[in-house]
């Protein structure tokens, strides 16, 4: 402690400038006799400090220090002994032969001194390996149910850490853990519930029972109730058919006497997917009550949660606007920022200017993290009130010019880009602000992002030539990465603006003298395309880019080179396509408001190597497309099966991911048998699962050849076949060698047209449409009886055909009774497929009709695709 004013003035962090060598030298004092407890405590604290600061200590040095620490066991000083336990835990990872202190720790763990026992348990579990764990198992069981709460908690928390090393041993302590959950001590009950959940985490049915049991038997600990709410929330999210009683339990916690539990329950309810406004209203009311709490932390948590909810349910949060208005002048800037941004998301259009003026007054005083919250609120606001972009855009531009982190600048740039893409009236102003930004941008990733946007959007503005100066400045002044992106942007101007093409060619010729070969190569390539003025080449190689899988392209080229036959040129059509061009940045959702999450098709690359390694499928060639995971069983079934369809040029491989949830069974020779009632589809090679133990996931495969009739859709029956061997649930060892055969009926396997089509967007749909000609054009008109409005019809036709919308044509303006969507993709084999679908609502009976035109460079492909909707 500081005893006088002088100590206070010279005080500071005594550990600030520690030298590792000096500390290890001082550690030799541990060998002195008699032991100076005060001095050794100070040295140990230094040693622990440098380890926790990430200082690297060699194993020899650490082992020498560790052996010195072990000699301190001779001291009876309580403070020194507790420091010894901490030092043992820290040195355990970097020292050799730490096992020598096992007997000393075990003695302290089972001794009468309660002050030592808890710390000894933590240290012992830190150094114990899987082989030694069984020797202390009896002591751990006793410690878990010990009457001393500190000892019980330390044993339970140590067991949670041991779950990572030897989960099977810890699972045997379930009875003791269950008893500890009944403890009167709040922390013991909380820790015991956490361990009990981890023990049962792999058994969904057991987790559901755990929630049901403790939701009825009121837990005393508010910490445990909060943890139970989190478990219940996960059950609701994971289950396909959630139990209503679980939701009722969470809702009942809104009336708990603990403020912490009330907030946790409210946060859980509003974070659940697919909740209705009536379901979240009680949670909103609870959060509104938390806003009046005298504790700043509770107010902050409530306002932050309301801020997140306002994005998805702005109308539900409007009832809190009066309370949120009071927080605008809150001295805590974090609370004030969250309150204002929430009001921006929920308030009326007339209040926007007033709120923006208030937040402009202190936006420079808050951290970048909260500035990003402000930016997100502006993004949401521009979606609700598009006309307010005249107020928002200058504010964003001012924020963009201020100092800030990369994430902060990225959030602003993404918001401006989203506004430009959503609101045509804001395009010119937004592009002007971004041009000004890249004049003095220190982040290459953001510069290339903006240059890509300029190349795509600026040629469509009334005065495209005004942007060329900003782009060419990047060629002169920036890094190689940015210069290359600028060259590509210039080429896109030349491709789309014929009157500017001669000027662009002059600029590209200057780029031929660049010091970097990437820039020179791009300039040479684009100059050749523009000079020849072949619109087909310009469309395919400048505007759309090469839309293939990078790893698939590499693998196909290697296969071509290894074949040794170069009489025919390399065919790009054998390369798997991708929705994103190689030259474009990662696909980003540009919408101003968050969309509902959709299951995404897995990337082809992880499966390509796996399938190529299976001899039966190695000759099929590259994977064209992989589907999303499709459930063929209920999630709570004894055996769960998910299917992934992998489409090749002339065949389809069905991958069945099987999981055994029965802990008393070992499944052998697991396979999926397919049967086509029409007799068109035939199963080829199959790969079965030899062994499927409890809790593990393995894959079986079946090959389907596309029928000679040309059919590309159908439904097949599926049956899971396997042999069952009974095993001991605890050890997993077989009870005997006897097996018996069993079957399990799965959901039907559907093969659709969309499985043979990969959606690939065209940046210039009109040029691509004209380039295909009219030789392979098919047209149909029909009624849509299963959809209720135009947006649903657009979404449905895109899913059925497997095509993706182009030029943001899937966004239907509100109130329109007729809309045309442009769709594009590639059919397996590399054949382009384009579609124009016009959807109209009959004003008399509100029925929906659709006229669809399909174009392809192969007539048979056009026939197959149109058959999917007829």
UniProtKB/Swiss-Prot annotation:
Gene3D superfamilies: Coatomer, gamma subunit, appendage domain (2.60.40.1480), Leucine-rich Repeat Variant (1.25.10.10), TATA-Binding Protein (3.30.310.10). This is Probable coatomer subunit gamma. It comes from the Eukaryota. One of its GO terms (cellular component) is endoplasmic reticulum. One of its GO terms (molecular function) is structural molecule activity. It is found in: Cytoplasm; Golgi apparatus membrane; Cytoplasmic vesicle, COPI-coated vesicle membrane. Keywords: Cytoplasm, Cytoplasmic vesicle, ER-Golgi transport, Golgi apparatus, Membrane, Protein transport, Repeat, Transport. Oligomeric complex that consists of at least the alpha, beta, beta', gamma, delta, epsilon and zeta subunits. HEAT repeats lie at residues 60-97, 99-133, 168-205, 278-315, 316-350, 389-425. InterPro entries: ARM-like, ARM-type_fold, Clathrin/coatomer_adapt-like_N, Clathrin_app_Ig-like_sf, Coatomer/calthrin_app_sub_C, Coatomer_g_Cpla, Coatomer_gsu, Coatomer_gsu_app_Ig-like_dom. It comes from Caenorhabditis elegans.
């Amino acid at each position: 402690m500081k005893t006088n004013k002088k100590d206070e003035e010279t005080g500071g962090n005594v550990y600030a400038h520690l030298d590792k060598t000096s500390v290890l030298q001082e550690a030799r004092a541990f060998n002195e006799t008699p032991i100076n407890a005060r001095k050794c405590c100070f040295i140990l604290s230094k040693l622990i400090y440098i380890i926790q600061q990430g200082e690297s200590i060699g194993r020899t040095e650490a082992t020498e220090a560790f052996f010195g620490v072990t000699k301190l066991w001779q001291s009876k000083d309580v403070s020194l002994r507790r420091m010894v336990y901490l030092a043992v835990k820290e040195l355990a990872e970097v020292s050799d032969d730490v096992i020598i202190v096992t007997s000393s720790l075990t003695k302290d763990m089972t001794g009468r001194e309660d002050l030592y026992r808890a710390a000894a348990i933590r240290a012992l579990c830190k150094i114990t390996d899987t082989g030694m764990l069984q020797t202390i198992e009896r002591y751990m069981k006793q410690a878990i149910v010990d009457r001393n709460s500190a000892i019980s908690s330390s044993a339970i928390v140590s067991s949670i850490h041991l779950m990572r090393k030897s989960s099977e041993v810890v699972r045997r302590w379930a009875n003791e853990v269950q008893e500890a959950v009944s403890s009167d001590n709040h922390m013991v009950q909380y820790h015991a519930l956490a361990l009990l959940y981890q023990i049962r985490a792999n058994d969904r049915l057991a987790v559901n029972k755990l929630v049901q049991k403790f939701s009825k038997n009121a837990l005393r600990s508010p910490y445990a109730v909060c943890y139970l709410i989190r478990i219940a929330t996960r059950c609701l999210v994971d289950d396909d058919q959630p139990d209503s009683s679980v939701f009722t339990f969470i809702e009942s916690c809104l009336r708990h006497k603990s403020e912490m539990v009330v907030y946790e329950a409210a946060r859980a309810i509003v974070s659940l997917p697919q909740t209705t406004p009536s379901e979240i209203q009680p949670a909103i009311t609870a959060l509104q009550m938390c806003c009046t709490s005298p504790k700043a932390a509770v107010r902050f948590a409530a306002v932050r949660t309301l801020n997140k909810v306002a994005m998805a349910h702005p109308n539900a949060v409007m009832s809190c606007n009066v309370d949120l208005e009071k927080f605008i002048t809150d001295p805590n800037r974090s609370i004030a920022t969250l309150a204002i941004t929430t009001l921006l998301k929920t308030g009326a259009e007339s209040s926007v200017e007033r709120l923006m003026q208030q937040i402009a007054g202190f936006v420079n005083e808050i951290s970048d993290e909260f500035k990003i919250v402000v930016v997100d609120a502006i993004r949401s606001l521009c979606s609700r009130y598009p006309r307010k972009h005249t107020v928002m855009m200058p504010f964003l531009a001012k924020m963009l010019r201020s100092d800030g982190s990369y994430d902060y600048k990225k959030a602003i740039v993404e918001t401006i880009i989203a506004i430009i893409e959503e609101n045509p009236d804001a395009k010119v102003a937004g592009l002007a602000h971004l041009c000004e930004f890249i004049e003095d941008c220190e982040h290459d990733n953001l510069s290339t992002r903006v240059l890509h946007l300029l190349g795509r959007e600026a040629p469509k503005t009334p005065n495209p030539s005004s942007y060329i100066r900003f782009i060419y400045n990047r060629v002169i002044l920036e890094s190689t990465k940015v210069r290359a992106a600028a060259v590509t942007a210039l080429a896109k101007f030349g491709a789309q603006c014929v009157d500017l093409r001669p000027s662009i060619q002059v600029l590209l010729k200057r780029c031929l003298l660049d010091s970097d070969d990437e820039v020179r190569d791009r300039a040479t390539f684009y100059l050749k395309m523009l000079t020849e003025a072949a619109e087909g080449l310009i469309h395919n190689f400048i505007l759309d880019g090469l839309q293939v899988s990078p790893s698939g392209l590499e693998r196909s080229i290697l296969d071509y080179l290894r074949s040794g036959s170069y009489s025919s040129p390399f065919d790009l059509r054998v390369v798997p396509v991708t929705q994103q061009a190689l030259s474009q940045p990662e696909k980003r959702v540009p919408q101003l408001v968050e969309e509902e999450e959709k299951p995404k098709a897995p990337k082809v690359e992880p499966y390509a190597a796996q399938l190529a390694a299976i001899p039966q499928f190695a000759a099929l060639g590259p994977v064209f497309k992989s589907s999303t995971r499709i459930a063929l069983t209920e999630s709570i079934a004894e055996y769960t099966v998910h299917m992934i369809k992998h489409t090749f040029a002339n065949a389809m491989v069905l991958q069945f991911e099987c999981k055994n949830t029965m802990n008393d069974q070992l499944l052998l020779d697991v396979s999926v048998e397919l049967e086509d009632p029409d007799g068109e589809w035939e199963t080829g090679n199959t790969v079965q699962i030899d062994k499927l133990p409890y809790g593990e996931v393995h894959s079986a495969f079946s090959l389907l050849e596309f029928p000679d009739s040309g059919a590309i859709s159908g439904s097949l029956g599926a049956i899971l076949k396997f042999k069952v061997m009974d095993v001991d649930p605890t050890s997993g060892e077989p009870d005997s060698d006897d097996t018996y055969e069993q079957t399990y009926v799965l959901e039907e396997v559907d093969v659709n047209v969309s499985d043979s089509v990969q959606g690939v967007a065209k940046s210039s749909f009109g040029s691509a449409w004209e380039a295909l000609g009219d030789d392979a054009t098919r047209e149909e008109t029909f009624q849509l009886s299963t959809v209720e409005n135009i947006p649903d019809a657009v979404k449905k036709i895109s899913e059925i055909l497997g095509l993706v919308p182009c030029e943001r044509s899937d966004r239907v303006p509100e109130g329109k009774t007729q809309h045309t969507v442009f769709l594009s993709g590639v059919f397996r084999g590399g054949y382009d497929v384009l579609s124009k679908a016009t959807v109209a609502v009959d004003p008399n009976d509100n029925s929906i009709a659709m006229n669809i035109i399909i174009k392809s460079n192969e007539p048979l492909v056009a026939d197959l695709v149109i058959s999917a909707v007829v």
